[in-house]
Amino acid sequence: FHIKPLPPVIVSLDVSIYDSSSYEDGITVMDRLGEGIIYAINIHGDPVWFVNSNIDWSNGGTYLIQFSHFLPDGGFIGIADGRSGNLSGRAFEMGIHNNLIWEGPGDVDNNGVHHDVFPMPNGNILALTIKDTLVPIPDEIDIPEEYSYIDSIPWHGDRIVEWDRDGNEVWSWSVFDHFDMQDFVSESYESMFTPPNNPTDFFYDWTHSNAVWYDIEDSVVYLSVRHLSRITKIDYPSGNILWNMGKSMPSGDVTVGNHLGLSGQHSVKVLDNRNIM
């Protein structure tokens, strides 16, 4: 057998704290955002496995892969980031030997799949995508005189999509259908009009969700909405919101956990004890 040369970023890893009484057994899987390398290390920081982005995609494109979840058969799913080649991000499944097993649709709107994908029990894949909607500038926003000719700005909002393994969309959910648009962060909105920003490049990154999780016991989807500092619990498949947890907003729709101090959280996960992390 032979061993592939290790990427330099893996070779340079060091363990700074090692408490054998507290460490969880097993290996730790990580990826390098923007570098297209997924790797695993043991308790000593030694690399035991890695895969890279040298993959033959059906469209001949170039993508940087990111890890999301392991599957029961030992493979894993993740996101293929195509922005460096002006391609939409897509979901994928790989085996541990760098073999591509499945490619999600590659023609998704805007930047395509972003941040997270999740394996459904039936084999389908949940993914985060983006939808654009042109929205009038809110009355409470004061914009500089030089931009007074602008009356509307595109809002980026998140859309959860479920695909079967043939790439068919079988379920979807959009923040534009379920969130109150008076819930937004005015400071980040106003920052778009700060020189040297170019008005032709304006869009408001309204929700910027970064994680999605399906819970089979309750048949619900959890969505982590970073820019609203909110976790949303969604009934599946009806799409009705059961609750919003996090920072209070003008709509009054956030009724759980206002005291928790959520601020730009980056994940949501249901633990084995049914708590939410």
Could you describe each region identified by the protein language model?
Residues 1-277:
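Histidine-/acidic-rich catalytic cores in large beta-rich domains
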